Amino acid sequence: MKEKTTQLYEGAYVFSVTLSEEARRKALEKVTSGIINYGGEILKIHDQGRKKLAYTIRGAREGYYYLIYFSVVPGVIAELWKEYHLNEDLLRFLTLKTDAVKEVLEFASLPE
């Protein structure tokens, strides 16, 4: 039997600022446990904190940003997206294939 190959992904998640710290932790745990339940592995989580949104989403002007690096079989992504759409605490999400886990996030300064 052929072994299924996993792919490395970078997931960006924006949670509602109306969540308490405990509720936000549980919402993040719901996302990570979903990945693990489908046979995935969490490699790195970057907590990017509270940031202003580019535009209003469901009345929110700010959100808590997390960047998660994980590996999973590619066919699982569609199932994860279904779960994400049902998660009311999650304002937005984006999942991209990537080649490497970034240990440190660096951002360029905006020009003056």
From Swiss-Prot:
Ribonucleoprotein among keywords: yes
Record-level GO BP terms: translation
Presence of the UniProt keyword Ligase in the record: no
GO cellular component labels: cytoplasm; ribonucleoprotein complex; ribosome
SUPFAM superfamilies: Ribosomal protein S6
Keywords: Ribonucleoprotein, Ribosomal protein, RNA-binding, rRNA-binding
GO molecular function: small ribosomal subunit rRNA binding; structural constituent of ribosome
CDD domains per record: bS6
Record's function text: Binds together with bS18 to 16S ribosomal RNA.
Protein family per UniProt: Belongs to the bacterial ribosomal protein bS6 family.
Cited PANTHER family: MITOCHONDRIAL 28S RIBOSOMAL PROTEIN S6, SMALL RIBOSOMAL SUBUNIT PROTEIN BS6M
Protein name: Small ribosomal subunit protein bS6
Organism encoding this protein: Chlamydia felis (strain Fe/C-56)
Gene name in the database record: rpsF
